[in-house]
């Protein structure tokens, strides 16, 4: 297998990926709290991990991908009380919304989507173990984790307990042994969902769910844990304390990966600034591929500034890729024969393929990888223009290999899947026949020097998303995908 290096937040350096189980890659990514429709900040980690998963599979790893839903949470409870409906009605509504927009963005479904509400027994069992081992204590129906008991606390975030206490905004509770102790179980309150437990009715704290569910499905040690950089502290720091305190396995996670923040026109995204964008609203103006490519155009660890201008640029960039795909599909149908130009194109394609894989193997650098993808697209389009400007044959073996390489790139990045289908579908034959009639009429107009009418046909077709291209071999049409 190709060697892969990843930046590990825990060690603050790049490391060669060495899986727990040879040939396998087990990953857990913190999912959404479904109390509203997903926003642009939610989309980035899931698109990022979708590409990581795709590439790991390409390299040859058997990937197990778990992503949770925090369907029991204060925000969900507040929303349900405000609307006068049950908490699970809210959670199910926005889980459905999550799948709708992520499916549109081409995010492949995780292998497992555990929910807090269906793993209460696992959570209670883990809390019991932590109490038995002296890492947690019960107070009037609440259960807290004692951070002083865990020697590695603060290693992920690079903070000492003294630093945390000095800079933390925490709810003052004089009952706790340490102000930084965090809740594993919360005693029931009026108007909130609750479950029976050894400490009385209540519900889980925020952090314990991910420890319980990741260990259940991936074991006490697994390869990747991901999420936004805002989760490093306290969520992921607390996860480590819980998971390692329970199992005794150190480390519980070999590689911690965190994506950077998204800003809106260089400002932090927030509802108070009225720059809080939902994915579903963005997709009303831009194609899913444009948004997906935009999210991947910058290295996942770097900040990403969202703006209409950047999305417009992404849209135009994808048009170049779409044109290259259309040109490859056209070249496949050309007369076969020996062609040195096609062989030279193939050699360039192999170079771009190697550069693409090197970039993806270096901490999943999609920004650099996509530059190789666009480099190959440019060469394909140059070759197409040269071939269609003269009568000639095409080396189909070379073109088939170029197509394989280019499709591999777009498949890993996860864009333009439909473009590869070409003009197919239930009515493809009838559509093609109709277009040939239109092209024939337009050609007659050109032969009779009715230029205005010929141009009118071309322009009207363009208005409905169909591009006409003229060449010495005749006109061809293609439907724009973006």
What are the language-model segments listed below?
Residues 69-74, 95-98, 108-123, 141-150:
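Short, glycine/charge-rich beta-strand/loop segments that flank catalytic centers
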Residues 61, 135, 466:
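Short phosphate-binding/catalytic loops that engage adenosine nucleotides
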Residues 80-87, 111-117, 228-229:
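The substrate-binding groove and active-site-proximal loops of carbohydrate-active enzymes
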Residues 1-35, 46, 50, 64, ...:
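Alpha-helical recognition segments enriched in aromatics with Gly/Pro capping
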